[in-house]
Amino acid sequence: MDYFALFNLPKKYIIDKFLLSKNFYKLQLKFHPDLFIHHSESKKRIVLQKSIEINKGYKILQDSLNRAIHLLFLNGFKISKEKVLSEDNSFLKKYFFLYEELDFLLKNNCDEVQIDIFFKKIRNKIDNYEKIIEIKFNEKKWDDIIKLITKLLFFKKIQTRLKQS
């Protein structure tokens, strides 16, 4: 499924999120299951499936990492984290060092300032990777994008863990 086509958006890494939301709500108004309660069971199933597809597509396009993975998929590529990471041991070492730093901060009840500094460091790394990914998409440098997305995934995991703490 091409979610860019579903939401009538250009197939680009950077999207107009306002337009995405606007088109999402238009589709929801058209395919919301509650609007079909008096229709046949088969029609209800079709509409429910379409609604699920719309919600899934919206979530994918809202998130920069998932949007990048979807764009790669549409261009015939699939990410294999294991293959990419096995080729870049230096990144894995840096990542594990950051994860150890995060564990230390969380286990030692460090103050909010230290955690905030670490969070900003991770946010900056994510922002930098996203900017580079945008450039690489424009250049159609698929192999570079795959490597960058795999690294971005790790920083997003650290960010998620920080937000949950």
Swiss-Prot record:
This is Co-chaperone protein HscB. GO terms for biological process: [2Fe-2S] cluster assembly; protein complex oligomerization; protein folding. Co-chaperone involved in the maturation of iron-sulfur cluster-containing proteins. Seems to help targeting proteins to be folded toward HscA. Belongs to the HscB family. Residues 2-74 form the J domain. Keywords: Chaperone. The lineage of its organism: Bacteria, Pseudomonadati, Pseudomonadota, Gammaproteobacteria, Enterobacterales. It comes from the Bacteria.
